[in-house]
A protein has these predicted regions:
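C-terminal catalytic core of tyrosine-transesterase DNA break-rejoin enzymes
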Residues: 4, 8, 107-130, 137
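Flexible coil/turn residues that form the inter-helical turn or adjacent wing/linker of helix-turn-helix
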Residues: 9, 76, 97, 116
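Conserved tyrosine-mediated DNA breakage-rejoining catalytic core shared by Y-recombinases
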Residues: 9-14, 18-53, 59
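A short linear hydrophobic-aromatic micro-motif
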Residues: 31-32, 97-100
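Catalytic-site neighborhood detector that most strongly recognizes the C-terminal catalytic loop/helix
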Residues: 35-38, 127, 131-152
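Active-site/catalytic core of tyrosine-dependent DNA strand-transfer enzymes
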Residues: 48-96
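Catalytic tyrosine of NAD(P)H-dependent dehydrogenase/reductases that use a Tyr as the general acid/base
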Residues: 101-102, 138
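C-terminal secondary-structure termini that scaffold catalytic or DNA-interacting sites
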Residues: 153-173
Length: 173
């Protein structure tokens, strides 16, 4: 459940641990982060599969609006160490060598920007960064990324595909 959430939102551990049931609006398809590093509430969209997963989880979990969304078996807030250990156990069972909650943020950012074609400014807002330079650190670009789907973004390829005539832009005089 938490793995899906991390891959949907790219949240940091402290933010995920602080989410209460009332912070999730499945009808609106968003989650409100009320406890962030910059102390500003963020509104983060949820994709359709995540909404379905959270609906099922809510039916199974129950709870009061002020209860933590992700909690221990006794209903208390997860500790950072408890969350880290749970993720490490899950990743080990799945054969994942590198395990860190923060790597989910990097994975989310890279997938959003490189693999899914999202834009850097929206990603910046989703991650809650005030500077685009901070977001840049989350998105390593490899040589293979430069050629992947390049025809979809090349002005020449787009013009040729649409049958448009290629004209030189006139200089302003």
């Amino acid at each position: 459940m938490i793995i899906n959430f991390l891959l949907n939102c790219g949240s940091c551990a402290a933010t995920v641990r602080a989410i209460q049931i009332r912070d999730v609006d499945l009808g609106g398809g968003v989650v409100f982060y009320r406890h962030t590093k910059n102390r500003k509430t963020q509104v983060i969209p949820l994709c359709s599969p995540m909404i379905a997963i959270l609906r099922e989880y809510g039916r199974y979990r129950g709870g009061e609006p002020t209860d933590y969304l992700f909690c221990t078996e006794t209903g208390t807030q997860l500790t950072e160490n408890g969350l880290r250990q749970s993720i490490a156990r899950y990743n080990t069972r799945c054969g994942v060598q590198k395990t860190s909650i923060h790597l989910f943020c990097h994975t989310f950012a890279r997938k959003y920007l490189i693999d899914c074609g999202g834009d850097a400014f929206t990603l910046q807002k989703l991650l809650g960064h005030s500077a685009l330079a901070t977001t840049k650190h989350y998105c390593a670009i490899y040589d293979a990324d430069l050629t992947k789907n390049y025809d979809n973004f090349s002005p020449l390829a787009q013009m040729k595909a649409s049958g448009a005539k290629i004209k030189m832009a006139a200089r302003g005089r």
